[in-house]
UniProtKB/Swiss-Prot annotation:
Predominant place of localization: secreted
Gene that this polypeptide is encoded by: AVR7
Subcellular location: Secreted
Pfam family, one: Avidin
Extent of the signal sequence: 1-24
Residue positions with a glycan: 41, 54, 93, 141
One GO location term (cellular component): extracellular region
Protein's name in the database: Avidin-related protein 7
C-alpha cells in the first residue's frame, strides 16, 4: 500500500540521485604523506602524466629495527579513475629485501582518503633450499597524515 508519505519518499530519492554524483566525483590522490596501521610513514611525490611517481618509505616494522633507514619507492597508477589502482616497489636501504605493494585509493564514507594495499616482501636467502621462507605476504591500510590546520 502507498500512503501520503510517497511524495516525501520520492523527494528523498530524487535528492539522493542529485547529490550522489557529486560525492563520487571527488578524486582520490596518492600525492602526499601517509601513515599505515602499523605506524610506518610514506611520502608520495607528484604523479606525472604517465601515472608514474616516486617517494620515500620509513617502516615501523623490521627484523632488525635498530637499522631502519628511509627507503626509496617507485610506482605507477591509473590516472583516469576517481579511485585509482596503483602499484609501487620499495627498495629497502637497510636490508637485502624488496617489497611490492598493489592497491586502490578510496574515498571512504566520511570523505577521507584511504589506501588499501596488499604487499609481498622478498628477503634474500643464501641457498635455494630456503626459498620457501623468503617471501612474506600482508596488507596495510594507509590514511593521509593530518596537517597542522586539521
Amino acid at each position: 500500500m502507498v500512503h501520503a508519505t510517497s511524495p516525501l519518499l520520492l523527494l528523498l530519492l530524487l535528492s539522493l540521485a542529485l547529490v550522489a554524483p557529486g560525492l563520487s566525483a571527488r578524486k582520490c590522490s596518492l600525492t602526499g604523506e601517509w601513515d599505515n596501521n602499523l605506524g610506518s610513514n610514506m611520502t608520495i611525490g607528484a604523479v606525472n602524466d604517465n601515472g608514474e611517481f616516486n617517494g620515500t618509505y620509513i617502516t615501523a616494522v623490521a627484523d632488525n629495527p635498530g637499522n631502519i633507514k628511509l627507503s626509496p619507492l617507485l610506482g605507477i597508477q591509473h590516472k583516469r579513475a576517481c579511485q585509482p589502482t596503483f602499484g609501487f616497489t620499495v627498495h629497502w636501504n637497510f636490508s637485502e629485501s624488496t617489497s611490492v605493494f598493489v592497491g586502490q585509493c578510496f574515498i571512504d564514507r566520511s570523505g577521507k582518503e584511504v589506501l588499501k594495499t596488499k604487499w609481498l616482501q622478498r628477503l634474500a636467502v643464501d641457498d635455494i633450499s630456503d626459498d620457501w621462507k623468503a617471501t612474506r605476504v600482508g596488507y596495510n591500510n594507509f590514511t593521509r597524515q593530518r596537517t597542522v590546520e586539521e
